[in-house]
């Protein structure tokens, strides 16, 4: 029983502990409970605000990422267009240069043909004039010399031909 008296509280002890507890509870609720609850409310509000700000920041970041992706896609399209235009311009320039070179080559070839034809005609004209002059000279020499027989004529013509070949 001695042990049981140590564990079982007495009525007076129980009464005073209850009174002290209630007074402490009243004092805490009157003076400490309000500031503690307001501090807890402020902390809860600040945490809620921080979470809202984080959600808003996340949404803003997602929006910026979407905008960034759209801008990158637009830049890629623009780059591809510029490259295609540059390739097209280069191809056009090369084709124009080929056409111009071909035209210029044809013009030079035609000018060379005309020049060659002119030179050929001039040379033929000169040869004809020379042949005519030679024929006239030969005829003149033949007519000056009276030829009596065919043998002398052949000999004279052979000499004149050799003379013409040497000149």
Curated annotation (Swiss-Prot):
Alphabetically ordered keywords of this record: ATP synthesis, Cell inner membrane, Cell membrane, CF(0), Hydrogen ion transport, Ion transport, Membrane, Transmembrane, Transmembrane helix, Transport
GO-annotated cellular components: plasma membrane; proton-transporting ATP synthase complex
Compartment list: Cell inner membrane
Annotated transmembrane regions: 15-37
Keyword Lipid biosynthesis (UniProt): no
The keyword Ion transport appears for this protein: yes
InterPro entries assigned to the protein according to its UniProt record, in alphabetical order: ATP_synth_B-like_membr_sf (IPR028987), ATP_synth_b/b'su_bac/chlpt (IPR002146), ATP_synth_F0_bsu_bac (IPR005864), ATP_synthase_B_chain (IPR050059)
Function: F(1)F(0) ATP synthase produces ATP from ADP in the presence of a proton or sodium gradient. F-type ATPases consist of two structural domains, F(1) containing the extramembraneous catalytic core and F(0) containing the membrane proton channel, linked together by a central stalk and a peripheral stalk. During catalysis, ATP synthesis in the catalytic domain of F(1) is coupled via a rotary mechanism of the central stalk subunits to proton translocation.
Alphabetical list of NCBIfam families matching this protein: ATP_synt_b, PRK14471.1
Annotated PANTHER family: ATP SYNTHASE SUBUNIT B (PTHR33445:SF1), ATP SYNTHASE SUBUNIT B', CHLOROPLASTIC (PTHR33445)
Subunit field text: F-type ATPases have 2 components, F(1) - the catalytic core - and F(0) - the membrane proton channel. F(1) has five subunits: alpha(3), beta(3), gamma(1), delta(1), epsilon(1). F(0) has three main subunits: a(1), b(2) and c(10-14). The alpha and beta chains form an alternating ring which encloses part of the gamma chain. F(1) is attached to F(0) by a central stalk formed by the gamma and epsilon chains, while a peripheral stalk is formed by the delta and b chains.
Protein name as it appears in the record: ATP synthase subunit b
Record organism: Cytophaga hutchinsonii (strain ATCC 33406 / DSM 1761 / CIP 103989 / NBRC 15051 / NCIMB 9469 / D465)
Gene from which the chain derives: atpF
């Amino acid at each position: 029983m001695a042990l049981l008296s140590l564990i079982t509280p007495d009525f007076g002890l129980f009464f005073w502990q209850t009174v002290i507890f209630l007074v402490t509870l009243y004092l805490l609720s009157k003076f400490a409970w309000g500031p503690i609850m307001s501090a807890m409310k402020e902390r809860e509000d600040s945490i809620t605000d921080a979470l809202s700000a984080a959600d808003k920041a996340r949404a803003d970041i997602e929006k910026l990422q979407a905008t960034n992706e759209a801008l990158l896609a637009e830049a890629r399209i623009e780059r591809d267009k510029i490259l295609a235009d540059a390739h097209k311009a280069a191809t056009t320039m090369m084709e124009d240069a080929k056409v111009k070179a071909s035209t210029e080559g044809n013009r030079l070839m035609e000018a060379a043909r005309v020049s060659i034809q002119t030179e050929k005609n001039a040379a033929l004209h000169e040869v004809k004039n020379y042949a005519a002059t030679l024929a006239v000279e030969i005829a003149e020499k033949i007519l000056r010399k009276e030829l009596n027989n065919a043998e002398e004529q052949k000999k004279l013509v052979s000499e004149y031909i050799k003379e013409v070949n040497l000149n």
